[in-house]
Amino acid sequence: MPYELISDYEPMGDQPQAIESLVNGLNKGYRFQTLLGVTGSGKTFTMANVIKEVNRPVLIISPNKTLAAQLYSEFKAFFPNNKVEFFISYYDYYQPEAYVPTKDLYIEKSADINDVIARMRMSAIKSIMTRRDVIVVASVSAIYACGDPRDFDTLNIKLEVGQRINLSEFVKKLVKIGYERKEDIGLTGSFRLRGDTLEIFPSYQDEGIRIELFGDEIDRMYTFDRMNRDVIERLDRLTIYPTKEYVTTEEKIERAVKSIRAELDEQVKKLRSEGKELEAQRLWQRTMNDIELLSTLGYCTGIENYSRHFDGRQPGEPPYSLLDYYDEDFIVFIDESHITIPQLRAMYHGEMSRKKSLVEYGFRLPCAYDNRPLKFDEFMQKVNQVIFVSATPGPYELEVSEQVVEQIIRPTGLIDPQVEVRPTRYQVDDLVNEIVQVKKRGEKALVTVLTKKTAEMLAEYLVEFNIRALYLHSELDAIKRVEVLKKLRAGEIDVVVGVNLLREGLDLPEVSLVAILDADTEGFLRSETTLIQIIGRTARNENGKVIMYADRITPAMQRAIDETNRRRKIQMEYNEKHGIKPKTIIKPLMEDIFAPFRDKEEEMYKVYEDSILQMKESLSLEEYAALLEEEMYKAASELRYEDAARLRDELFKIKEELNRN
């Protein structure tokens, strides 16, 4: 079905010409375009209108989970009758497999998978494979290795009313595509049999499937609510898809086992020729154990490291990823491209450096190298048409784009804020006075500093003046970051103090003041791009103001101020010509899509801390004490005081042991 855009608004300001230009560019076959839209100009609404006009499958890549969640909520509201999906990493906690040669320390992979996110990922894959009206909002997880789309497409079960089936064979097919027989009602990825009724609970949808048999014939089929078990829809036909991202056939397993064994023989021979007998023996034992498990169970821990053998790829060939599930004509939007593009470039290299030690010291076969994220050039080869979206596009986007579409005029008539430069002397006292005035107007403030410690200390200091403040930095996980921002928008706090996390894409119309402390410090946190992004945080409020605390004006500050003034001039002239009076954006609170995940947090932290406590045997007492102290302070900063106390008690024991020695 076509996309149906639901909105109370029509395109305004620069949006109509931006939509027309981008749609024309897509229709002309432009491979790369850039939407250079100032903060608050409605870039997301422009994207939504482009999607509606071209009516093709879409992938939107965001630089982090927080912004991905925000975009997901907005597109769900714009397209309630189409498929809007969410695809981010499904790990609540993830410790990758690693080997540290200097300490002879092997760290086994440890992970806690979030079932809710896993279900959302499977829903995204199923939607891409079965529909054209699909928008997937993803993080950079979109370029990581995924299951073979050919398996997902072929390993499904098609059923229709009146069809005759052999029940025992049908159950075997369900098991082959990842389902487990369970008696628990509604357990994701399971099925249960009660007389002539079969109930299936796929991972890619919330509803269960009920199949009623009459003898060996399908009599009726329904979808039903897992909780109250009410029938939702009667079905004439349906397709049951695999319940896991990684499923494969017995033939592929047999072929992979032979191929793995051949690579093992070759690598063991190579290690022995280099005089690495210990490494060769280790690799032989570990890999033969995996081969035995694969042959008997069809699965082993770390099976993803053998994905090249299952896929039939040659060494060095790119793995399958989410991109391979799409039709060739899909469109990619890269949001906040000035940070997402560098991330996409960096992912491959970080993964390779970790795996090098595992292969060289006999923990993994070289095929582990091929379970990886895509290289940047591989990513670019797999995408068809790309629209970069940013208020400050980077040099790569500007260089490759066949057109750059500017969106300077906001639909609300809001203009870029005035920027003041004030001396750093007494900057905190001056800041307190400014925040008090903001608070009186019922508005909010953001303060950006240079270090995490400063963010924490300043937030605590502001509380002493009856200013409700919280800090925001990289050590807070995605769920807690969303919570802090939601509290600001809901009026539960007055100020958020942060480091670089205040820059990108935060949609906070209640914020009328942005204060930049130590604005004249050289570095990436005070670069021209960063400063323009920070200034943009208050561009959604008619009382918007930015204060830079600095004792000199750096070149980066000057360029950011000049660009802001250029935009202000264009906006003010447009408003005067059309008789527009600026007004603050009114926006409802974002849907809290992370709500279902919170129940797992306590269990997740317990698993994480247990893994820390278990490292005692692998480290010296001094190293173990340092690790405990670091994690204790981290837990305290996240307000996990019980966890911090547990780590503190362990630290006291170790220090006593050190003193005795």
From Swiss-Prot:
Motif Beta-hairpin per record, residues: 90-113
Organism encoding this protein: Fervidobacterium nodosum (strain ATCC 35602 / DSM 5306 / Rt17-B1)
Signal peptide from the UniProt entry: none
Protein name: UvrABC system protein B
Binding residues for ATP: G37, V38, T39, G40, S41, G42, K43, T44
Physiological role: The UvrABC repair system catalyzes the recognition and processing of DNA lesions. A damage recognition complex composed of 2 UvrA and 2 UvrB subunits scans DNA for abnormalities. Upon binding of the UvrA(2)B(2) complex to a putative damaged site, the DNA wraps around one UvrB monomer. DNA wrap is dependent on ATP binding by UvrB and probably causes local melting of the DNA helix, facilitating insertion of UvrB beta-hairpin between the DNA strands. Then UvrB probes one DNA strand for the presence of a lesion.
Subunit structure: Forms a heterotetramer with UvrA during the search for lesions. Interacts with UvrC in an incision complex.
Record HAMAP family: UvrB (MF_00204)
NCBIfam families: PRK05298.1, uvrb
A Gene Ontology biological process term: SOS response
Stretches assigned to the UVR domain: 622-657
Family recorded in the similarity comment: Belongs to the UvrB family.
Source organism phylogeny: Bacteria, Thermotogati, Thermotogota, Thermotogae, Thermotogales
SMART domains according to UniProt: DEXDc, HELICc
Free-text note on domains in this protein's UniProt record: The beta-hairpin motif is involved in DNA binding.
Keywords, in A-Z order: ATP-binding, Cytoplasm, DNA damage, DNA excision, DNA repair, Excision nuclease, Helicase, Hydrolase, Nucleotide-binding, SOS response
